[in-house]
């Protein structure tokens, strides 16, 4: 404890130019990490595309096989019988495939290297924090990364395939054939992946607000019904097929985030009336 306090004290005595030099070295390390990862992913990109990014185009993708095993009737469970066909992508612009390989390498380097980037930044600011602040920041770092990757996993294995199948097979008229471009596919893929990664950061945000006393458990007890309704609406918008089964499997993880967030808020009295969590629950 004394060593950590002395480290914090000594960091406060560092000159401005020394801090600037440390920041420069930190940014240089971050750039090296991202460049190395980007080059590695650029080399491996053909395999990553075939076995990861384009996997939802295949009829053998796990969620399609699950619905096929259940036997969708189109009413309660989506009918994905047409999913026996692979979704074909086309490229209509010269150089698009090369640019897609380069941009995807950069995006993947950011996603995979994000924990390393945060860790290097953490090493830079750590000497200026108190021990209690360090422990809180360390928990937030680990928890935030886990939730971000969990959100992307849910989007990849569940949300994106359902949206892809629906939009790829939807027809305004039989005279209009769907021809999906590579750009359109990649834009939708990254949008959904990153969106759900950020959505799953909600528990971390709630935890931080709870630590600062901005939000309490009474809030979750009071607005639980509103949360259920809002999550159902969001799940209905995300689930284009509209069947109850797809709606439920999208609704379940989203609503679980709400309840999980409530558990992260510290117990105690409310700011506005001093009511305890038990009295708020009794009112609900």
Regions found by a protein language model. Give the residues of each.
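Membrane topogenic/interface segments and analogous intrinsically disordered interaction regions
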Residues: 1-284
């Amino acid at each position: 404890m004394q060593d950590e306090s002395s480290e914090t004290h000594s960091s406060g005595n560092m000159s401005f130019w020394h801090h600037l030099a440390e920041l420069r070295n930190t940014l240089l390390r971050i750039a090296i990490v991202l460049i190395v990862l980007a080059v590695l992913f650029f080399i491996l990109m053909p395999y990553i595309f075939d076995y990861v990014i384009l996997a939802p185009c295949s009829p053998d993708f796990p969620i399609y096989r699950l619905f096929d095993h259940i036997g969708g009737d189109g009413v309660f469970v989506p009918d994905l019988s047409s999913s026996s066909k692979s979704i074909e992508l086309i490229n209509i612009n010269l150089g698009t495939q090369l640019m897609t390989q380069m941009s995807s390498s950069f995006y993947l380097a950011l996603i995979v290297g994000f924990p390393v980037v945060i860790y290097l930044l953490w090493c830079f600011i750590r000497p200026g924090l108190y021990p209690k602040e360090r422990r809180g920041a360390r928990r937030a770092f680990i928890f935030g990364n886990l939730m971000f990757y969990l959100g992307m996993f849910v989007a990849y294995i569940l949300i994106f395939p359902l949206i892809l199948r629906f939009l790829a097979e939807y027809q305004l008229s039989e005279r209009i054939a769907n021809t999906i471009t590579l750009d359109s596919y990649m834009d939708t893929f990254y949008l959904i992946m990153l969106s759900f990664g950020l959505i799953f950061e909600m528990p971390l945000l709630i935890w931080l607000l709870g630590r600062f006393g901005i939000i309490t458990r009474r809030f979750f007890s009071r607005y639980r019904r509103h949360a259920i309704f809002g999550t159902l609406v969001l799940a209905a918008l995300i689930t284009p097929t509209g069947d109850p089964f797809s709606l439920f499997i999208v609704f379940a993880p989203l609503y679980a985030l709400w309840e999980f967030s409530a558990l992260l808020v510290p117990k105690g009295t409310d700011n506005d009336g001093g009511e305890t969590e038990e009295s708020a629950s009794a009112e609900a």
